[in-house]
């Protein structure tokens, strides 16, 4: 389910010249023992392992949250093997709100961390990359080389500061809205909602409606101007955020139910 493996246009291989080795965890969460088993001794025929990445929360696994103890155990196992550790924390603060565990505690086992400001926090643009002084200096150089310098970025930073100060706790509302949306779709003929809605994402399968996910998405846009992502042939992903109200959840759920019932195979 790893985001850096399944998306980003293969940037890991293109820009870093690196290949990935996927660990088959439970809902995107693997164990220290699985990490130990996956790290192969470097030989002529095998690439040298260098880094382990944890995605918090796990997007394609339904927004699942890594427990703090699992994070610590994987971090310790990685250090024992001399591996660099990175947290893809695009939705880290959703995990913070869901568990009550601080971002600092979740981040402690990692050398570097990525935090997105434009998802649940609601900024129009922006993200934060964190690490030690030497790493950040190198990151700035590579950012410049690859055309990532912005002019001017102060207004983006100001929005990020506001979001971090005012929008974190309110994400609990997004989580509640996601659970509510899942409940509203729960008994819809032709719709199969995935279990375990932990944060702000709801995944559901539309195969029973006779439509593909892309067809279902396009018809929702056409009929009700509602946009829900098509993630796979039949799998769809709905994401709640600060612009989605309880009334909006009910409206969207009604539209999904109506479309599903109208297209059920007869």
Which residue stretches match the model-derived regions?
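Conserved PLP-enzyme active-site core in the AAT-like
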Residues: 1-195, 199-223, 229-244, 251-266
């Amino acid at each position: 389910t790893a985001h850096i493996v399944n998306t980003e246009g293969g940037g890991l291989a293109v820009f870093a010249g690196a290949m990935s080795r996927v660990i088959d965890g439970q809902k995107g969460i693997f164990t220290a023992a699985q990490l130990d088993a996956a790290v192969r001794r470097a030989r002529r025929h095998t690439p040298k392992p260098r880094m382990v990445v944890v995605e918090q929360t796990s997007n394609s696994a339904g927004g699942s949250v890594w427990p703090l103890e699992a994070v610590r155990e994987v971090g310790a196992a990685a250090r024992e093997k001399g591996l660099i550790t990175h947290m893809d924390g695009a939705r880290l603060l959703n995990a913070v709100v869901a568990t009550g565990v601080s971002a600092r505690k979740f981040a402690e086992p990692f050398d570097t961390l990525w935090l997105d400001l434009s998802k649940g926090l609601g900024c129009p643009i922006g993200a934060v990359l964190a690490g030690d002084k030497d790493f950040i200096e190198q990151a700035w150089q590579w950012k410049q080389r690859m055309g990532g310098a912005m002019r001017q970025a102060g207004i983006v930073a100001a929005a990020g500061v506001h979001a971090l100060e005012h929008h974190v706790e309110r994400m609990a509302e997004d989580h509640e809205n996601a659970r509510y949306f899942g409940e509203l779709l729960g008994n819809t003929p032709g719709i199969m909602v995935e279990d375990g809605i932990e944060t702000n994402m709801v995944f559901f399968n539309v195969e029973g409606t006779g439509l593909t996910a892309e067809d279902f998405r396009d018809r929702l846009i056409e009929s009700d101007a509602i946009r829900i992502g098509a993630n796979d042939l039949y799998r769809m992903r709905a994401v709640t955020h600060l612009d989605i109200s309880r009334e909006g959840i009910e409206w969207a759920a009604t539209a999904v139910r109506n479309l599903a019932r109208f297209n059920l195979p007869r």
